[in-house]
């Protein structure tokens, strides 16, 4: 080996080894301080890509587990509401069993029906107000998908169903059955509306006290008075909803036949543009709500327009029937909010929207459809019959026969077979609850499986990117020793050129 001064090969070699040990020491210290074997892609490029995919799966599955727990919470919330609905149905069934006992008086049956009605209203309230995070869970049918996986399409569907009185088949449920109506039936009809209206027919004056629902006659000899809503329902919660009220006075004529006159106030309930049909003839309401006596109802008959004002109606025009429309301009009707149709069997049958008058002119039955509900008037019978829906009639005069029936099969079935109806409703609630219970078990299973998967993925990722402290501590110790040795050797290597100077002495 040549003896040179300019190039110290031993020093350069020592420095190179010292740099290597320094790099190893830095890497070991970085891994020990971070706990990771892979701190950047240069540490292990392939391992970093694999570990990153594991991280995506782990994070997605962890969130999916939380989603599944939310699904359990939704199912539990819904089932809790259904449990309350079930409790109310059980009470309704208990009351229905009590009502079928023949020892009950009319007062007992009314009390039972009142509690049943409250229970049914509570079922509707629970249905409308139960929600989870702003989502109503019983007010409509809904297929709610819960993401329980890290990839697209990995979902479990919760089948939320609408559960209320109507969907349970209990709309119009009545264990009290048909009964004769009295003035007492009117007293809660307009409980949320204040004020009264006074109408006159001839010499007689009538006043409807809307606040109490009572009907008052100002003359000494009260005639038969009907109070009805033109839209087929008396009950109203808002004075602004324009529910029309008609008063009908029925007296016995000299010829022994029943005569009816109407006191017009119902036209105030219509709104401009509303129409009604009679025997294919369409009437259009020209009056606006709150108009005076100049408000109009118009149609075209045989190519000629027929117009009536409120004042015309108030004079007591004749009832509408097929013959009237086909041969005369003398047309009378009450006005409603929306559309209605008469369905007369003969030309001579007479019918009004808000009341079906049973008299000598009625042959068989006349039928009227109001907002989708059908009612019939029959010349036979001597009682006012209520079945199912809200319909209040005051029948106080003698010698007049009126029969009003609701043509609703569901209501009749409920009244005839109350226990079967309740059992059917309970079965539906049980089916929904069973479905929710099964879905909760599915979520529990999914959560367990997700937990196992996340654990295994974490283990696999750890083997790739986590630092092995035993190995790294050993590497650090080795690097430290090499650093110390290298530093000492470098000092010796740097002294080699000094030895060359001895040759010059």
Swiss-Prot record:
It comes from the Bacteria. Pfam families: Flagellin_C, Flagellin_N, FliC-like_3rd. Keywords: Bacterial flagellum, Secreted. It is found in: Secreted; Bacterial flagellum. Its main location: secreted. GO terms for molecular function: structural molecule activity. GO terms for cellular component: bacterial-type flagellum; extracellular region. Belongs to the bacterial flagellin family. Flagellin is the subunit protein which polymerizes to form the filaments of bacterial flagella. Individual Salmonella serotypes usually alternate between the production of 2 antigenic forms of flagella, termed phase 1 and phase 2, each specified by separate structural genes. This is Flagellin. It comes from Salmonella montevideo. The gene is fliC.
């Amino acid at each position: 080996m040549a003896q040179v001064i300019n190039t110290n090969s031993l020093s350069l070699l020592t420095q190179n080894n010292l740099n290597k040990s320094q790099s190893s020491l830095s890497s070991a210290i970085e891994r020990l301080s971070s706990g990771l074997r892979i701190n950047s892609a240069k540490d292990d490029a392939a391992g970093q890509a694999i570990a990153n995919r594991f991280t995506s799966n782990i994070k997605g599955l962890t969130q999916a587990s939380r989603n599944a727990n939310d699904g359990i919470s939704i199912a539990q919330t819904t089932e809790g509401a259904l449990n309350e609905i079930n409790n109310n149905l059980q009470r309704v069934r208990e009351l229905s069993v009590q009502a079928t006992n023949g020892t009950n008086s009319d007062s007992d049956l009314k009390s039972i029906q009142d509690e049943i009605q409250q229970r049914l209203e509570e079922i509707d309230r629970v249905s409308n107000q139960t929600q989870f995070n702003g989502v109503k869970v019983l007010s409509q049918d809904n297929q709610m998908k819960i993401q329980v996986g890290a990839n697209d399409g990995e979902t479990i569907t919760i089948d939320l169903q609408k559960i209320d009185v109507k969907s349970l088949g209990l709309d119009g449920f009545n264990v009290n059955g048909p009964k004769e109506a009295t003035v007492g039936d009117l007293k809660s009809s307009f409980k949320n509306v204040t004020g009264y209206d006074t109408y006159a027919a001839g010499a007689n004056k009538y006043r409807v006290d809307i606040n109490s629902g009572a009907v008052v006659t100002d003359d000494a000899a009260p005639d038969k008075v009907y109070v009805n809503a033109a839209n087929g329902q008396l009950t109203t919660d808002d004075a602004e909803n324009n529910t029309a009220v008609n008063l009908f006075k029925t007296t016995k004529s000299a010829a022994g036949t029943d005569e009816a006159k109407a006191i017009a106030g119902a036209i105030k309930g219509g709104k401009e543009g509303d129409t009604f049909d009679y025997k294919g003839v369409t009437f259009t309401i020209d009056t606006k709500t709150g108009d005076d006596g100049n408000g109009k109802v118009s149609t075209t008959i045989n190519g000629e327009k027929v117009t009536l004002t409120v004042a015309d109606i108030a004079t007591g025009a004749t009832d509408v029937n097929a013959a009237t429309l086909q041969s005369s301009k003398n047309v009378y009707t009450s006005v409603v909010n929306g559309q209605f149709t008469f369905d007369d069997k003969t030309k001579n049958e007479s019918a009004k929207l808000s009341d079906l008058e049973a008299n000598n002119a009625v042959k068989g039955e006349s039928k009227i459809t109001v907002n989708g509900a059908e009612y019939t008037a029959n010349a036979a019978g001597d009682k006012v019959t209520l079945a199912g829906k809200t319909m209040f009639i005051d029948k106080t005069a003698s010698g007049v026969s009126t029969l009003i029936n609701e043509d609703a099969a569901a209501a009749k079935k409920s009244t005839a077979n109350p226990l079967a109806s309740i059992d059917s409703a309970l079965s539906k609630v049980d089916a929904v609850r069973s479905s929710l219970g099964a879905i909760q078990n599915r979520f529990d299973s999914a959560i367990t499986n997700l937990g196992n998967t996340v654990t295994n993925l974490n283990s696999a990722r750890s083997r790739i990117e986590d630092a092995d402290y035993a190995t790294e501590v050993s590497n650090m110790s080795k690097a430290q020793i090499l650093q110390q040795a290298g530093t000492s050797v470098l000092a010796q290597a740097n002294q080699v050129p000094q030895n060359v100077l001895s040759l010059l002495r």
